[in-house]
Amino acid sequence: MTSKTETIHVVDKRRSYAGENASSRRAIPAGWRAHSVLLGYFGADNARRFLQDKALKPELVNELMQQREFAHTRIQSLPPVDTKKSSSRPLEDANALAEISRVMARPDCQGAYPEGTWTAELVEIANIIPIQPYLDLDYAGSLGDSDLAPSDPLTAVKLCFAEKHPTEFHVSVEESQKAINISGINPSLEVVGLRYEQQQNDGPVVLSFMVSPAPNIVSVPRYAGRHFLASGYHRVYRLMKLGFTHVPCAVSEAKTLPQIGMRGRALFSEAVLMAPRPPRFPDFADMVLGIVVPFKPMHRVVRIRPDEYFVSG
């Protein structure tokens, strides 16, 4: 008895959100998720490697590479960005600032965003530069409450400066390896707050730490007159599709490009981010630049295991 791969038809969410007729569909394997990927900003070799890392079938990779060629050609014709034009303004509403201060006073937020290192601002979505090349269309469409009003960007404050939502995770212990594994669907799950304490002189040392996702804040570092999106991709996309032109966020000043949060290999290069026409956030919703690619759901795993070894005295 042979099994058949179950597939479902997934509508391009960008068309459905815009109220347009979805004339094209791609069969996506059941259990996979549709992402918008800015493949046109990759070189051909890097784009193919990126797609192959997603375990896609060769024929789909070839099809997506053809779409990447169209996107790359389109990018060459786009006008450069104007870094002299202001893309942000201070957020001055007293009630909004009080809510932001309350959230940012949380210990996890103070650790990630120390007081005095950021300001609350409204940044124009059209001029935000993404540093990562993809986002989950289905997840983005699920965010936000019914009280979001595009005519009033302050209605998005609670979404963009959010309380940390409970994150489900699984813990397993490997006693033979003296290891603990923590896994969950949140991609920002990490070790925070590492501490130690010695109970008595020459007594045992007690180590403690927390495993937690990063603060749920839309963060936009500013460097060389450009605004880069460090976190909050799905919320910004949701707001953009609802008609918001500006997003409330925590803006920090970066002295070097690496300070904007460029960690991980699946990010745009410095040459792309500082190009005359870098990626812009609305590109994710563009029918040529934002190429729909199926991704397998990923789990974040944090493994804690002590290294025990001898060193010469």
Describe each region flagged by the PLM:
Residues 2-25, 29-30, 34-36, 40-43:
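Mixed-charge, low-complexity intrinsically disordered regions
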Residues 26-163:
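N-terminal extension/subdomain marker
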Residues 110-226:
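Short alpha-helix boundary/capping and kink motifs at helix termini
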Residues 224-241:
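A sequence-level detector for short glycine-anchored, His/Arg-bearing signature motifs
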Residues 228, 247-251:
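Short hydrophobic alpha-helical runs that function as membrane-insertion/retention elements
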Residues 233, 242-244, 253-255:
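A short beta-strand motif that forms part of the nucleic acid-binding face
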Residues 250-296:
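Accessory, usually C-terminal, subdomains that scaffold auxiliary metal cofactors
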Residues 300-313:
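C-terminal catalytic or substrate-handling cores of phosphate/nucleotide-
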